[in-house]
Amino acid sequence: NELGKFDLRFRYSRLTTLIDNTDPAILNNQTTVLLFKRLVVELAQAFNYAQNFSNQLKYPYVGYKGTLSSSKFQYINEATLVTEDGCTLSDADGIIQVVKEAAGEVAVINSNVGTLDYTTGKMTLVSFKPITVEAVVNNNTIEIFVQTNVLDITPIREQVIIVEKKDI
């Protein structure tokens, strides 16, 4: 096992080879790898947050959406003052938004709560104010997921790569 230790790189090809070799019936696989961080937030209070994924993030063209996503939380729509359940974070050309999907449509609840630097992997949230969070780890933690630009991932500065059993 090459994960769970400092200074070791995640090799996508090794993972897919392991998957292919688990059973002769598996001829090929399409595996998606996401980086994630757990962000502990202050509920119902506006705070600034910063996370650094320390890897280049996927941004193949202007207008691409889907590099960043998150677990769900409750957020107040400042335009309507309505509390929205089931909100998530998303990105649009380096701007982080609060969005909500319903009936296949994505509604933007807040069009700018921070930035995402695709080159450095740095994410900042400004005056971010979730009311409650959908408990994944605990009642004040949001999981943030990003797609990397390359499939091999290098942990930098106190990062450890772990594959959790619940994600397999």
Per-segment meaning from a language model:
Residues A25-L27, F36-E84, N138-I168:
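Polar low-complexity, Ser/Thr/Gly/Ala/Asp/Asn-rich disordered segments used for subunit assembly
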